[in-house]
Swiss-Prot record:
NCBIfam families: leuS_bact (TIGR00396). GO terms for molecular function: aminoacyl-tRNA deacylase activity; ATP binding; leucine-tRNA ligase activity. One of its GO terms (cellular component) is cytosol. A motif ('KMSKS' region) lies at residues 576-580. GO terms for biological process: leucyl-tRNA aminoacylation. PANTHER family: LEUCINE--TRNA LIGASE, MITOCHONDRIAL, LEUCYL-TRNA SYNTHETASE. A motif ('HIGH' region) lies at residues 40-51. Its main location: cytoplasm. It is an enzyme of class 6 (ligase). The gene is leuS. CDD domains: Anticodon_Ia_Leu_BEm, LeuRS_core. It is found in: Cytoplasm. This is Leucine--tRNA ligase.
Length: 807
């Protein structure tokens, strides 16, 4: 009987669906394992082989944990609101809902054809009113807690798309060729900054890649500094700046404020006013990225005003420059060009003084010195001296002096800004707020507030969403009076902030999630997705989760206990897959050619899961040959009879099998799937070479392989007489004695260089290892005439001699 992947994969996918094989159990006595994908946006281009990598990894873990006796929750859904469907609607007039439904159907079919063991009864869609009812409910809870507010915000406006972009979205849109400018707009904003400290501290509680944690730390950007008041000459007020280096105050030679600073025009003297206004207008046309880029040429304009340095009484010129942002600190900085590269470049361009106040190894007029490791110089007045002090001591002494003089105060600041939450588009969750004629706002009482049908999807010329044109939906009256509904909708991030909770209890119409179910399943044990979401989805989800924790809706402080970022699979040309490059490999094509099991195995065998690696279609053919070898362990293709026997395997085969159990188990637990597969290949080769068709070894192999290649293993499992699914088979346990080599190869090094090897029995004592190593002929000559300073023996692995010539 030949291996026909197409027939048997369809057979088992249909049976799994009919029998709901992978539905999570309601039994809360079993240990749970919640494994989750970052659910996809269902685009019109469909899934390619790169998309399948993360989904395959989570499915392997789901199947592996089921075999280990866990109650597994492994769901799938759709992050289906978003701009692409709306842009398609603008071009074609097709309702975004229809486009989304079509795309979802395509994605679902591909995922099912991969044999992923999702519990499809828990499928969610962020555009479903029964789902976004609870997204709106969370928003209203944020509003009640004062964490959602309206503000006139300078936003990133994309003229072509007629939409506001979050700061985190700007880079991508510019890269796609869109123009992004700054303009003020009435916006809903979420006060994520209220949770900045907790978002920072609780990173220590989760098992995440360190680079992702660091990206979030940098994005939150906690800094300890001092706010210092500089008295403005000719103005009866102060200019407050924020600095993390009060120890350099004596070296400040000018101040800089942002173009949006409320005092920008007020500080301009008559002769400078025209230039100042012109500069402010030019700054509005730039994005923050364009303004703050390190390679950007420094620009600025002098206001004509001066402020007094509280440390030495000097009058410092006040400049305006777009590299300073109002959103960070106070929107004003003191510039110490000798010890800050950006300030140094600005000073050089505009001929401003440069004064050394940190002892430098070179002339600061020629090169900046920004090291904290040196000590202060030229930093004293009649009341205080910090000369000779290190950074920390000088910081504390200067801060204390400024506070005692009423000229400053210690302050913790964050780069993190409140989250601009509203979008001027149709295809998003309506914000459930009513604006009354008396200026008050009240929440919608009947959720969900659904989207009305519209004739055109273009944003209005005023920047409002198309909802502003639907008067029958827009205006209403209730017991509080006449009202106008909010026309902004939520960003795509809203629905993905909490979807992991809805998977736990997707049909609940009375609560976001049942408390007992939430307490059993949370938090997510393993979350796999791309690192590109480090400061977007992951940060937003953590914020919402902490709000829900404070509300008593969830029982954990963090949503995702373990995070793993898969590496990107590149095209065969070693470039990122994209339509423009023509290097996209559609998932459906390779599935029809090679089958799901081969694709799953090849995706995982390409290399370490976390690494970037190129696709090679020829490589998958080797995987197909491996699967045929597995098939032939059970079936004789010539006689169409089974080969399986009840014979006891030889001692050598048993040892090989238990080594494989140990290696595959350990590697799977650590998501080292490529080496787990390699170990199974070694086992299959051994069984084939020795002609071992023992039921014991074959069934063990099938269970080990089942998370990786579920269709072929399910078929062969049933062929061997089992009536229950292999997904419920017990994961094999290795015998430590059999999994250990009797004889080991020991490496011998001299001064860290390999000079020979010898064989020794397992458990060989360190002293015996050292003596045996000295007798190795190729080693002895490197010890001759040498004094052995140190002898190191690592049991079962190596011996190293540290030597030096004898005196």
């Amino acid at each position: 009987m030949k291996y026909d992947f197409s027939a048997l994969e369809k057979k088992w996918q249909a049976r799994w669906a009919d029998e709901q094989t992978f539905a999570s159990s309601a039994d809360q006595d079993k240990p749970k394992y919640y494994v989750l994908d970052m659910f996809p946006y269902p685009s019109g281009s469909g899934l390619h082989v790169g998309h399948l990598e993360g989904y395959t990894a989570t499915d392997i873990m789901a199947r592996y944990k089921r075999c280990q006796g866990h109650n597994v929750l492994h769901p799938m859904g759709w992050d289906a609101f978003g701009l692409p469907a709306e842009q398609f609607a603008i071009k074609t007039g097709t309702h975004p809902r229809l486009t989304t439904e079509k795309n979802v159907a395509s994605f679902r079919e591909t995922l099912k054809s991969m044999g992923f063991s999702y519990d499809w009864s828990r499928e969610v869609n962020t555009t479903d009113p029964n789902y976004f009812k609870w997204t709106q409910w969370i928003f209203l809870k944020l509003y009640e807690k004062g964490l959602a507010y309206i503000s006139e915000v300078d936003v990133n406006w994309c003229e072509e798309l007629k939409v506001v972009l979050a700061n985190e979205e700007v880079d991508e849109k510019i890269a796609d060729g869109y123009t992004v400018v700054r303009r003020p707009l009435r916006q809903w904003v979420l006060k994520i900054t209220a949770y900045a400290e907790r978002l920072l501290e609780d990173l220590d509680e989760v098992d995440w890649p360190e680079n992702v944690k660091q990206m979030q730390r940098n994005w939150i950007g906690r800094s300890e500094g001092v706010e210092i008041d500089f008295e403005l000459r000719c103005h009866r007020t102060n200019l407050r700046v924020y600095t993390t280096r009060p120890d350099t105050l004596f070296g400040a030679t000018y101040l800089v404020i942002s173009p949006e600073h409320p005092m920008a025009e007020k500080l301009a003297i008559a002769q400078q006013l025209v230039e100042v206004k012109k500069y402010i207008e030019q700054a509005k046309l730039k994005t923050e990225l364009e303004r703050t880029g390190l390679q950007k040429e420094k620009t600025g304009v002098f206001t004509g005003s001066y402020a007094i340095n509280p440390a030495n009484g000097e009058a410092l010129p006040v400049w305006i420059s777009d590299f300073v942002l109002t959103s960070y600190g106070t929107g004003a900085i003191m510039s110490v060009p000798a010890h800050d590269s950006r300030d140094w470049e600005f000073a050089k361009k505009f001929g401003l003084p440069i004064r050394e106040v940190i002892k430098s190894p070179h002339d600061v007029q020629e090169e900046v010195f920004d090291g904290k490791e040196s000590v202060c110089v030229n930093s004293a007045n009649d009341e205080i001296s910090i000369d000779g002090l290190d950074f920390k001591t000088a910081f504390d002494r200067m801060a204390t002096w400024l506070e005692s003089k009423g000229k400053g105060k210690r302050k913790v600041n964050y780069k993190l800004r409140d989250w601009v939450f509203s979008r001027q588009r149709y295809w998003g969750e309506p914000i459930p707020i009513k604006h009354y004629e008396d200026g008050t706002m009240r929440p919608e009482t009947n959720l969900p507030l659904t989207l009305p049908e519209v004739e055109a999807y273009h944003p209005t010329s005023t920047g409002e969403s198309p909802l502003a044109n639907i008067e029958s939906w827009l205006y209403g009256e209730d017991e509080h009076g006449k009202f106008r509904r909010e026309t902004n909708t939520m960003p795509q991030w809203a629905g993905s902030c909490w979807y992991y909770l809805r998977f736990i209890d997707p049909q609940n119409g009375n609560a976001l999630v049942d408390p007992s179910r939430e307490q059993y399943w949370m938090n997510v044990d393993l979350y796999i997705g791309g690192a590109e979401h480090a400061v977007l989805h992951l940060l937003y989800s953590r914020f919402w989760h902490k709000v829900l924790y404070d509300l008593g809706v969830v029982s954990t402080k963090e949503p995702f206990q373990r995070l793993f970022n898969q590496g990107m699979i590149l095209g065969e040309d070693n470039e990122k897959m994209s339509k423009s490059r023509g290097n996209v490999i559609p998932a459906d094509h390779v599935l029809s050619t090679y089958g799901a099991d081969a694709v799953r195995l090849y995706e995982m065998f390409l290399g370490p899961l976390e690494q970037v690696k190129p696709w090679n279609t020829h490589g998958i053919e080797g995987i197909s040959r491996f699967l045929n070898k597995v098939w032939r362990l059970v079936w004789d293709e010539n006689t169409e009879t089974q080969k399986t026997t009840d014979d006891k395997p030889s001692e050598a085969v048993l040892k090989r099998m238990h080594k494989a159990i140990k290696k595959v188990t350990e590697d799977t637990e650590q998501l080292k799937f490529n080496t787990a597969i390699s170990e199974m290949m070694v086992l299959v080769n051994e069984l084939t070479k020795t002609g071992c068709y023992s039921r014991e070894t074959t069934e063990t192999l099938l269970v080990l392989l089942s998370p990786f290649a579920p269709h072929i293993t399910e078929e062969l499992w049933q062929t061997l007489g089992h009536t229950e699914s292999i997904s419920g088979a017990v994961w094999p346990v290795f015998d430590a004695k059999l999994a250990t080599d009797d004889v080991l190869t020991i490496a011998v090094q001299v001064n860290g260089k390999l000079r020979g090897t010898f064989e020794a029995p397992a458990g060989y004592a360190k002293e015996d290892m050292i003596e045996s190593a000295k007798k190795v002929e190729s080693v002895a000559k490197f010890l001759e005439g040498q004094q052995i300073i140190k002898e190191i023996a690592v049991p079962g692995k190596l011996v190293n001699f540290a030597v030096k010539p004898q005196q």
